[in-house]
UniProtKB/Swiss-Prot annotation:
Reaction catalysed by this enzyme: L-histidinol + 2 NAD(+) + H2O = L-histidine + 2 NADH + 3 H(+)
EC number: 1.1.1.23
Residues that coordinate or bind Zn(2+): 259, 262, 361, 420
Cited NCBIfam families: hisD
This protein's UniProt keywords: Amino-acid biosynthesis, Histidine biosynthesis, Metal-binding, NAD, Oxidoreductase, Zinc
GO BP annotations, alphabetical order: L-histidine biosynthetic process
Record-given protein name: Histidinol dehydrogenase
Cofactor: Zn(2+)
Pathway: Amino-acid biosynthesis; L-histidine biosynthesis; L-histidine from 5-phospho-alpha-D-ribose 1-diphosphate: step 9/9
Function: Catalyzes the sequential NAD-dependent oxidations of L-histidinol to L-histidinaldehyde and then to L-histidine.
Lineage start: Bacteria, Pseudomonadati, Pseudomonadota, Alphaproteobacteria, Hyphomicrobiales
Disulfide bond annotation, renumbered to this chain: none
Length: 430
C-alpha cells in the first residue's frame, strides 16, 4: 500500500518530517575495496584495467583493445534504427541551443579610483564522462553530459563505458559521436574513474569527471575529488507532481510510473487537495503497472517509496514542495505559472499538464542531470558552467596603489603578516 500523508491529521508534521528523512538506498561500505582499486590503477595503469575488466566484465581488453575504434562507431550507426538516430539528433540540437544561452560573458570595468577589475571565463581543458553499462546505459545521458561540455568549449571529452561480456550499447556510441566525444574507452567501475583521474598508458588524465554510476563509481569519485573535479553524487531518481482534480488521472499516473520504472529506489510523489482524485490516480497506477516491461521495478518503487500527500489547499503545497526539494517537480494546476516564482527548491520545474517530465529527459533542451535526495536546496542541475571556470582580473597603476595601499598595509599588520605589508610598502617607499 502506497504511503498516504494527510495534512489534516494531527501528527502530519511528524510523519512528513520522517518521510523527508527516510533513506531510499542502502549505502554499501565499499570504500576500502574502491581505494584498493584506485591505488592499483594509479600504480599499474593499463595492466590493472585489463585485470579488473577480465574479473568484473568478463572481457579480454588485450584482444579488443581499451579504446573503441571509429570503425566500431561506424558499425553502431549502421545497426541503429534511422528513426532513433534522427530523434537523438533532434535532442542534441535542442540541448545545444538551450545550453548556448547559458554561456557567461567576460566582464572588465574601471571603478571610480581607476582600478581595473573583471572576470574571465575559460573552459576546462579535458573532462571525463562516465556512462554506466547494462540497463542504465542511456544514450540520452551521453547527450546531456557531453553537449554542455562541447558548448562550453572543452577541448577533449573522454567517455568511459563498461562492456560486460564485450557488449556495448550501439546507441551510446552513436550519441557519443553526435555530441562530439573525442575518445571512448571500454572500461567501467571504480577502475575507470581512477584511469580518468590519474591516467594510464592508454588513457590520458582529465581535469573533471561527470556522470552517474553505482556505489563503487560514487565512492571512486569521492576518493579522486581534489585531484580532479566532480559533478555530483547522484541518488535514485524522483518526481513530485502537484496536481488538481481537473487533470486526467491516467496522465498523472503515467508520469509517476515514468520515474518508478527507473529504479526500485526511485520515488514518485503525488500532492493534491482532492482525495477522490488521488484515489483515481492510484487506481490508474495499478492498471498501468501491468502494462510495463519493467513492471517488477516500477511496482517495487511505487510500493516502497511512492507517496500521496493530501493538502488542505494548494497554498499549503508550496512550502511542502520547497521542503521536499524534488529532482523533478511537475506543476499541473489551474494557474501553474503563479506557482513557479514561489518555488525555491527544485532541480527542474515542468509547468502545466502538457509538460510531462519525460520531455525534459529527452528532447526539451534543458538538462536531465539534476540534484537528488533534497540536494536541490543547495545545488543545481548540470549546465555549461560546470565545464567552465572563472578567473578574476585586477590591474592597478601607481596612483591606484597609492590610494589603496595604506589600507592594505594596515590590515596586513593587524593580521600579523609583515611580508604582506612589505609587499605594498616597498612599492610606496613607506
Amino acid at each position: 500500500m502506497v504511503t498516504t500523508l494527510r495534512q489534516t491529521d494531527p501528527d502530519f508534521e511528524q510523519k512528513f518530517a520522517a518521510f523527508l528523512s527516510g533513506k531510499r538506498e542502502v549505502s554499501e561500505d565499499v570504500d576500502r575495496a574502491v581505494r584498493e582499486i584506485v591505488d592499483r590503477v594509479r600504480r599499474e595503469g593499463d595492466s590493472a584495467l585489463l585485470d579488473y575488466s577480465r574479473r568484473f566484465d568478463r572481457i579480454d581488453l588485450e584482444k579488443t583493445g581499451i579504446a573503441v575504434t571509429e570503425a566500431e562507431i561506424d558499425a553502431a550507426f549502421d545497426a541503429a534504427p534511422a528513426s532513433t538516430v534522427e530523434a537523438l539528433k533532434l535532442a542534441r540540437d535542442r540541448i545545444e541551443k538551450h545550453h548556448a544561452r547559458q554561456l557567461p560573458k567576460d566582464d572588465r570595468y574601471t571603478d571610480a579610483l581607476g582600478v581595473e577589475l573583471g572576470s574571465r571565463w575559460t573552459a576546462i581543458e579535458a573532462v571525463g564522462l562516465y556512462v554506466p553499462g547494462g540497463t542504465a546505459s542511456y544514450p540520452s545521458s551521453v547527450l546531456m553530459n557531453a553537449m554542455p561540455a562541447k558548448v562550453a568549449g572543452v577541448d577533449r571529452i573522454v567517455m568511459v563505458v563498461p562492456a560486460p561480456d564485450g557488449n556495448l550499447n550501439p546507441l551510446v556510441l552513436v550519441a557519443a559521436r553526435l555530441a562530439g566525444v573525442s575518445e571512448i574507452y571500454r572500461v567501467g567501475g571504480a577502475q575507470a574513474i581512477a584511469a580518468l583521474a590519474y591516467g594510464t598508458e592508454t588513457i590520458r588524465p582529465v581535469a573533471k569527471i561527470v556522470g552517474p554510476g553505482n556505489a563503487y563509481v560514487a565512492a571512486a569519485k569521492r576518493i579522486v575529488f581534489g585531484t580532479v573535479g566532480i559533478d555530483m553524487i547522484a541518488g535514485p531518481s524522483e518526481v513530485l507532481i502537484v496536481a488538481d482534480k481537473d487533470n486526467n488521472p491516467d496522465w498523472i499516473a503515467a508520469d509517476l510510473l515514468a520515474q518508478a520504472e527507473h529504479d526500485t529506489a526511485a520515488q514518485s510523489i503525488l500532492m493534491t487537495n482532492d482525495e477522490a482524485f488521488a484515489h483515481a490516480v492510484e487506481e490508474a497506477v495499478e492498471r498501468q503497472l501491468h502494462t510495463l516491461a519493467r513492471t517488477e521495478t516500477a511496482s517495487a518503487s511505487w510500493r516502497d517509496f511512492g507517496a500521496v500527500i493530501l493538502v488542505k489547499d494548494f497554498e499549503d503545497a508550496i512550502p511542502l514542495a520547497n521542503r521536499i526539494a524534488a529532482e523533478h517537480l511537475e506543476i499541473a494546476v489551474a494557474d501553474a505559472e503563479a506557482f513557479v516564482p514561489r518555488i525555491r527548491n527544485a532541480g527542474s520545474i515542468f509547468i502545466g499538464g502538457y509538460t510531462p517530465e519525460v520531455i525534459g529527459d529527452y528532447v526539451g533542451g534543458c538538462n536531465h542531470v539534476l540534484p537528488t535526495a533534497r540536494s536541490a536546496r543547495f545545488s543545481s542541475g548540470l549546465s555549461v558552467l560546470d565545464y567552465m571556470k572563472r578567473t578574476s582580473l585586477l590591474k592597478l597603476g601607481s596612483e591606484q596603489l597609492r590610494a589603496l595601499g595604506p589600507a592594505a598595509i594596515e590590515i596586513a599588520r593587524a593580521e600579523g603578516l609583515d611580508a604582506h605589508a612589505q609587499s605594498v610598502a616597498i612599492r610606496l617607499n613607506l
